From Swiss-Prot:
CC terms in the record's Gene Ontology section: plasma membrane
Chain's role: Plasma membrane transporter mediating the uptake by cells of the water soluble vitamin B2/riboflavin that plays a key role in biochemical oxidation-reduction reactions of the carbohydrate, lipid, and amino acid metabolism.
Transmembrane feature ranges: 11-31, 38-58, 73-93, 111-131, 138-158, 199-219, 285-305, 321-341, 344-364, 381-401, 412-432
Listed Pfam families: SLC52_ribofla_tr
Protein name: Solute carrier family 52, riboflavin transporter, member 3-B
Membrane topology: Multi-pass membrane protein
Localisation: Cell membrane
Reaction catalyzed: riboflavin(in) = riboflavin(out)
Record family assignment: Belongs to the riboflavin transporter family.
Amino acid sequence: MSLFTHVLACLFGIGSWVAINGMWVELPLIVTAIPEGWLLPSYLTIIIQMANIGPLFITLMHRFRPGVLDERPVIYTIVAVGVVATFLLAFLWKHTLTFGDGEHSAALLSLSFLLSVVDCTSSVTFLPFMMRLQPQYLTTYFIGEGLSGLVPALVALVQGVGVVHCKNASANANFSLGNISQSLLETHYQPANFSTQGFFLFLSAMMMVCLGAFLLLNLHPAVAREHKSMKGYIDDSRRVEKIDLSQSPNDETPEQRPMLDFPEGSAIKQRSSFGKGTYSRTELVFIFVVLAWVNALTNAVLPSVQSYSCLPYGNQAYHLAATLSSVANPVACFIAMFVPIRSLVLMGVLTVTGTGFGAYIMAMAALSPCPLLINDDLGAALIVITWVIFVLSLSYVKVIIGVILRDEGHSALVWCGAVVQLGSMLGALSMFPLISVYRLFQSGDPCNTKCP
């Protein structure tokens, strides 16, 4: 076992989702500077769902042309695209084009789509590559995958968020009774500790580190000794379920693992059943309904309205909610790694609890730009704490479901991945028209919005 290989596996895992996770925690600084404004989170949610064309293509290739697609050229391609896209974002994220009904952040949205394709495709290519190494390096890879959310969140906390200053400006309003002068306030944002450009360059550097780690995992002589024999790799690649996922500290994301069903033999068909049969059909339906529900909430519904629920309380509240909730996800994984309670009752209680906190978030978003306690520091503290508890509780639920379904066999994990994507897709499709078409949620101005 090589420490050098462990470090490379960890750095490789960090590159899996660092770009999109970084985009989410940087939104508090981006939404105030682009034409889409508060609508950007809902756009980003639907973009990520569209990016599933990447893993869909890889999955279909593995399903209908098994053994034809080598994941290594795909990984080189997507990581290189990630490096270039994040680098371009650093210089183009503010650039707009005028078309249709006004200005749009074409560069930001198109590059975000590329990054979404990169990260979504990593879910079905990085792990098959790790199967080429000895099994003990899987644990380190999953630690890196968990850090892909934690590292950009910590950097964003250091970055901070610009303080809002309101400056007087005069505006003339012409009425039928005469010319009346009224005082308006202009919003000015003080720069953060370092710029959004610097943050995207950091993400580009992280993707370059991932690319370098991948190169060394393929080419370094010390790592070559850690590779399995070709026969062992081929056998494992045809039996993805043989990986011991119980070693993973990041069990909350079974949807990020390749769960491909290759009906090539009786042994595989047998393993594709729901394993131990520990749970009744009703209990399994309950588990999958909960899985779809929590993924709809955490991956689409609530992230789409995060700006509406937090920005009325100020940029600082939005910044803390975005970053601390990103930290809450790996914290939930860490807790579940040591306390993996497979209780359906606990799962139900945590789901109801998380949904309750989610309902509070949705209510504050619906009341935007004048939610409860808008003029009180308690309101800002409550919305940040609510976001953290919401993510923490439902992330733990996803971990428990992943553990349960992993024990039930390969077929259960296949259904797990499908239900996760279905829940996320339904959540995104339901929220996008409400936010972007019917405009049921209202944005505000930090200086001129007057609330009772």
